[in-house]
């Protein structure tokens, strides 16, 4: 799209669009609505809100902020990179401190959206392709996690982690499904989110190694908050209340979750159908921004994400 505007005009428009999309994503420091909204909605509503609708924010950054205002995006990139890194670490630490399962999953999304924004504004083909793939993978992973947490809450009548324990002894299939969804959320190799998160970190490393290094800490924190929740809710001896109220997944519930888990596994092993679509668009966007901002920002990075990872 060919547009002619003054520098100040472009920057003000970029800031307006960026703030709006950052709220929608959400991204630190305009993220505060998400945990409260997730806590006070139904699991199905949380899936729609976080797994689907919030992608409008990050997609808007990709399609509008970068494409319409490339010079302003380049001008604002240092600040956005810092905010993205803060969002990644803050979201992970906040998730680690939660006792409410819905708020915990919501804060994991704050961290994940930080990764997406980091990848977009690192502006390398690998990082942008990783960020775009992250939007898709996060939607599947978070949908599965919210639904399974919702099934637990529906049965027990409580959102508090401390009210559970020993669920795997009374509902082993539910516990197994939750383990897979949780491992995908912490980006375990072999599951779809790993490829996108690795792409973001690898692509960011070539331009902002400090940001990539700090963000990698969140992968360790993710292991802590996911496995902490799993250990406290699924392992140990079930209380009399858990034995009485928590039952195994129904067949209908299983058939809702199974396709999501299957996609996480299939695209974790064979992401080519997605990367073949996303890589060219990422390369085109990065090339457009580089041409608009001048040769000093050009990158020699040749490719993006393939079946074997980022190259």
Please annotate each region the language model reported.
Residues 1-232:
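Hydrophobic transmembrane alpha-helices and their helix-loop junctions in integral membrane proteins
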């Amino acid at each position: 799209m060919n547009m002619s505007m003054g520098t100040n005009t472009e920057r003000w428009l970029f800031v307006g669009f960026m703030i709006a999309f950052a709220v929608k994503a959400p991204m630190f420091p305009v993220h505060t609505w998400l945990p409260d909204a997730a806590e006070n909605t139904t699991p199905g509503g949380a899936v729609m809100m976080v797994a689907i609708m919030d992608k409008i924010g990050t997609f808007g950054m990709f399609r509008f902020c970068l494409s319409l205002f490339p010079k302003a995006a380049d001008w604002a990139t240092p600040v956005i990179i810092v905010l993205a890194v803060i969002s990644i670490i803050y979201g992970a630490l906040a998730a680690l401190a939660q006792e409410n399962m819905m708020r915990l999953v919501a804060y994991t999304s704050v961290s994940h959206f930080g990764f997406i924004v980091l990848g977009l504004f690192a502006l390398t083909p690998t990082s942008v392709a990783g960020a775009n793939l992250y939007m898709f993978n996060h939607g599947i992973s978070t949908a599965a996690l919210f639904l399974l947490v919702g099934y637990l809450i529906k049965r027990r009548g409580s959102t508090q982690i401390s009210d559970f324990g020993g669920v795997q002894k009374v509902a082993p299939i539910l516990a197994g499904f939750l383990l897979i969804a949780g491992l995908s959320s912490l980006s375990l190799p072999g599951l779809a989110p790993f490829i996108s998160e690795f792409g973001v970190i690898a692509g960011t490393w070539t331009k902002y190694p400090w940001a990539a290094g700090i963000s990698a800490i969140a992968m360790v924190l993710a292991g802590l908050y996911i496995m902490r929740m799993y250990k406290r809710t699924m392992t140990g001896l079930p209380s009399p209340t858990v034995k009485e109220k928590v039952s195994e997944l129904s067949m209908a519930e299983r058939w809702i979750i199974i396709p999501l888990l299957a996609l996480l596994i299939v695209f974790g092993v064979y992401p080519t159908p997605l990367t073949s679509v996303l890589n060219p668009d990422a390369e085109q966007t990065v090339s457009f921004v580089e041409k608009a901002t001048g040769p000093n920002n050009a990158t020699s990075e040749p490719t993006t994400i393939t079946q074997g990872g980022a190259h």
